């Protein structure tokens, strides 16, 4: 069977499908992920051809042009100081509307509860009432207060998702404030922006996949989810990727 479906409810008994493998010269793309995706999914492939991209097999020469994750699995385990169990990630809720002081209170309580990493919600980016660097400073204080009680240091991934022209400024301000890690929604900003950020920071990057459903939940177009939220995000430089189930 051709694994082109994300949900069991999308199975159709009377539809014949074919698996086709096509080779392209990688010299056509250089290190430009937008051009790669345009070639594989552009024009007829995304409109009338009813074709879904299931996977990409990169040549070693092409893959070497990308840094990929700076930390990788072992690096993230060392960063967390955890090598013998899964790492627990939590996020600040409500999604929006919190001042740094209000968010810090929730951060502190969450840290006491045993979270290893705490991230912003993907909806909480760069509002006027809570700039990323303000959250970093406030949440670091909360993390230190929790450490005094638990002996465990919780890492904070600040959401720097924004317009492309602002992204590096957000990186610098977060770094100067003492951020542990960065979060970026690559589904909204694109793999090439994720790659650019990864090339301009030494901090670990948590890639968020909010919005990728429109890429992979179609049965006759788009790409498979392991490619959309896995291989391409890792190639572009995500150390961690936030992946939901098909049901939320």
Question: What kind of region is each of these model predictions?
Answer:
Residues 1-111:
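N-terminal capping/small domains of soluble enzymes
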Residues 69-79, 125-146, 166, 186-202, ...:
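Active-site-adjacent beta->alpha loops and helix N-cap segments on the catalytic face
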Residues 86-104, 154-166, 212-225:
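Active-site mouth loops of central-metabolism enzymes
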Residues 86-93, 118-120, 154-160, 182-184, ...:
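Hydrophobic faces of well-ordered beta-strands that scaffold small-molecule active sites
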Residues 90, 97-124, 130-132, 143, ...:
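Phosphate-binding glycine-rich loops and their immediate beta-loop-alpha structural context
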Residues 102-113, 135-147, 193-199, 226-235:
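Structured alpha-helical segments in the cores of large, soluble enzyme domains
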Residues 135, 139, 143-154, 158, ...:
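N-terminal active-site wall of soluble small-molecule enzyme domains
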Residues 169-171, 177, 181-248:
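Catalytic alpha/beta core domains of metabolic enzymes, predominantly
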